[in-house]
Amino acid sequence: MTEFLPFVARHIGPRHEDERAMLAALGLPSMETLITQAVPASIRLNRALNLPAALSEADALAELGTIMGRNVVKKSFIGAGYHGVHTPPVIQRNLFENPAWYTAYTPYQSEISQGRLELLFHFQTLVAELTGLPVACASLLDEATAVAEAIGVACRHHRDKRSRILLAGELHPQTVDVVNTRAEPLGWEIATGSDVDDNTAAIVVPWPDTRGVYGDFAKVIADAKAKGALVIAVADPLALTIMEAPARWGADMAVGSMQRYGVPMGFGGPHAAYLAVSEVLTRIIPGRIVGQSVDAHGRAAYRLALQTREQHIRRDKATSNICTAQALLANMAAAFAIWHGPAGLQAIAMRVAALAARFAAALKAAGVEIAGESLFDTVTAKVPGKAAAIAAEADKGGRLIRIIDTDTVGVTFDETSTEEDLTALASLFGTKPVGGDTVLVPGKERGEGFLTQEVFHSHRSETEMMRFLRRLADKDLALDRAMIPLGSCTMKLNAAAEMMPVSWNTVANLHPFAPAEQVQGYAKMTSDLEAWLCEITGFAGVSLQPNAGSQGEYAGLMAIRHYHQARGQGHRNICLIPSSAHGTNPASASMAGMSVVVVNCRPDGDIDIDDLKAKAEKHRDNLAAFMITYPSTYGVFEEGIKAFCEIVHDNGGQVYFDGANLNALVGLARPADIGADVCHMNLHKTFCIPHGGGGPGVGPIGVAKHLVPYLPGHVEAGSEHAVAAAQFGSASILVITWMYIRMMGGAGLKKATEAAILNANYIAHRLKGVYPILYTGAHDRVAHECIVDTRVLKDSAGITVEDVAKRLIDYGFHAPTMSWPVAGTLMIEPTESEPKLEIDRLCDAMIAIAGEAKKVADGVWPADDNPLANAPHTASDTLATEWKHPYTRAEAIFPGGAFDPTAKYWPPVSRVDNVGGDRNLICSCPPVAAYG
């Protein structure tokens, strides 16, 4: 038996004796027998992964520390959308570094997500107040993506009858790059200047622009309004604390990055972007929206609103392919605003503006030409032929400034900038700081009050803030409290040793456009990770740029698109997708300019190979791609996977391999060996980056050799087709995956996969006598997850899958994935990290729930008044003076009788009214004046 270092044993839940007991329950002599039965021989990797030997936690931290120590952290004045920040320690320790916040899942189960939903609601309120627009989503991936998404909203608003987009000012280069990538497959015409015509869907107004200048856009905005074009403001949210809200000067939408609200630069990410819109656009915006509703007893409760817009329901007709966004970072930004309050935010903004104004005045006094007259934080100076020399001199003093071209430099101030910095920077131009007025746009200063809501005025002491964040966290159920058995989500351990480096100075505080020689630690770490992921998947090249799984899908499909175009086959636009696919698949295909053709599945869940063959041959002249999830979304290793790939290749298409279920393959099989041409890998699933309550995520893609030239580029690297604002996307959290692979080694990764498959098969075995297990493969085995058919309870007792999901809360569990991929069922994925004790506790709860349903079926409890129909039960409901239910209080809150009351999770609200919440949409808190 292989001896593993302590970390491997600590990452994997079942002990050796547990593994033996679980295998015995399955009637198997060994793990090898299980893998032989579950995983088709035709795809199995018959060698060990060629990865570095596993290190202990201490040794891995030391090695990574040495690598990241090669980075040279200098004070950045580069700007261009990335700024130095002071993350309040109370937020860093109690939110950013707190597993109660970072291990939570997207808040689909609202009753156990009230804490993070509340803080996201405050984020939306913050954005609405800053922009003056009534509706904001709960974050997008980055500023560049948000601009592209806003353009998509404008085109949908015009029902795609308009396709021209006017960039009315100078946006950051990376934003233009991402917009151009998005525009090509969707047929958008990107123009610059001020000419608005009848085909213009929207104008994009930077506020301020990449030079730091507030331009005069009054005429182009008036022209846009006259022509019916929408106005999109790209606005700095710190500047908006002292500048007039964009809605006041005609913006229909506003977007930007909330990074400077307490979130470190992190060499490019992750950061939360914002998007706010006018009311008429509410139902076509992308991303999650948190709304306020009520629970079954009329108490205010938060929930995800308007989900019918999203990809998991609307598929190729969705408003976006985005699912995971940046919830953790949005919550940090909201907490930053709550901590400082409106006066504190304005003080930061005024100080930044004053430094920039004094710097501008000093340069003007020295005869240096600067761009514009109305500035906030950035001064762009003309220095003919001297840009590189001045930047080099700044570098010697430990400061980085932006080289725009050979004759132009930019200097951006932020909340970390000091008087000493101002003096040193002025000296580069042969001058000294002078007094200067804060140069805002005349008539555009913020006159009205903002953030008058009580929450932004109530937490000024650290004691209050610490307890506020604790109260919110206590409302939620995250991995630090219990198992989250969500199918297709891989909620595994996010080990402390993996998370620690994210906060290191050498990881968190580098600008993504810092000189290459100063980021050699990142270069080495990302190079390691790319090589390891290539070995794990079998591909020739990897891009780490996509900052979510959805963006990985998009990047992979765009690589396929560009490959076909380069071969003179740009007409290939048909994407075959099984009916069982994740909703992001068709949504991503549509974004990549492809038309979706659905491939049928057989009654046993497998892809209908005859239907695939017929449709591939029918569309052979135009076939671009086939998207497949493996193991299937039904949790089964399909025997015909290689044949599927051959059919597609024979008809001129490329195979896109959805890596959502890669946790069942690592060390056992490789997508490229199976026949895939491209695959995205969810580092926030298989490779231990936490879900953060709805982001961040990372979705790198691996590609075969012929697709390597078509991986995403970046304007800073002299290439194009970027899908994210930064070259390495959410770079700072890549260290989590580096640590995971380094501490597991090839053998440990394989062992984790085997344990995940064992845990899932053990659950299927324990539950199959009570609930049908819908789909199994050869030898009656599942992969790493299983579908439990709770419709038997509906048939016998009228108990719905939602009743079961909410009752599991009373048992102390987050519900499994509900009604997907099969309506009325639960899909359970335990991962390798859950111990046998917790797995048995879940199985016991599911069996007990079936027993409770039988009492309803037998008439012991009425169909409309029983513990399942009334679940979940709150403390206040249970402690009510009157108890009129036919079951006892103990049966309500300590079901099964054997559950430890000291470990009881109390949901803060009872069942939330979803329908009422959508009918009466409330997605931000009204200002105090609204109550007058």
From Swiss-Prot:
Origin, by domain of life? Bacteria
Q: Name one Pfam family in it.
A: GDC-P
**Is the keyword Oxidoreductase assigned to this protein?**
yes
Kindly list the GO molecular function terms attached to this UniProt entry.
glycine binding; glycine dehydrogenase (decarboxylating) activity; pyridoxal phosphate binding
Which Gene Ontology BP annotations are present?
glycine decarboxylation via glycine cleavage system
Q: Which residues carry this modification: N6-(pyridoxal phosphate)lysine?
A: K685
Q: Which residues constitute the signal peptide according to the record?
A: none
Q: Which reaction does it catalyse?
A: N(6)-[(R)-lipoyl]-L-lysyl-[glycine-cleavage complex H protein] + glycine + H(+) = N(6)-[(R)-S(8)-aminomethyldihydrolipoyl]-L-lysyl-[glycine-cleavage complex H protein] + CO2
Q: Name one GO cellular component term.
A: cytosol
What InterPro entries does its record include? GcvP, GDC-P_C, GDC-P_N, GDC_P, PyrdxlP-dep_Trfase, PyrdxlP-dep_Trfase_major, PyrdxlP-dep_Trfase_small
Family listed: Belongs to the GcvP family.
How is the subunit organization of this protein annotated in UniProt?
The glycine cleavage system is composed of four proteins: P, T, L and H.
The record's listing under PANTHER family reads: GLYCINE DEHYDROGENASE (DECARBOXYLATING), MITOCHONDRIAL, GLYCINE DEHYDROGENASE, DECARBOXYLATING
What does this protein's UniProt record list under function?
The glycine cleavage system catalyzes the degradation of glycine. The P protein binds the alpha-amino group of glycine through its pyridoxal phosphate cofactor; CO(2) is released and the remaining methylamine moiety is then transferred to the lipoamide cofactor of the H protein.
Q: What name appears for this protein in its UniProt entry?
A: Glycine dehydrogenase (decarboxylating)
